[in-house]
């Protein structure tokens, strides 16, 4: 995985 994908997933769950 890429850091950007990890961040995107985390952002989605945080929201």
From Swiss-Prot:
Keywords: Stress response
Induction comment: By water stress.
Additional remark text: On the 2D-gel the determined pI of this unknown protein is: 6.2, its MW is: 21 kDa.
Full protein name: Unknown protein from 2D-PAGE of needles
UniProt organism field: Pinus pinaster (Maritime pine)
Organism phylogeny: Eukaryota, Viridiplantae, Streptophyta, Embryophyta, Tracheophyta
């Amino acid at each position: 995985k890429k850091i950007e994908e990890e961040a995107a997933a985390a952002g989605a769950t945080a929201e």
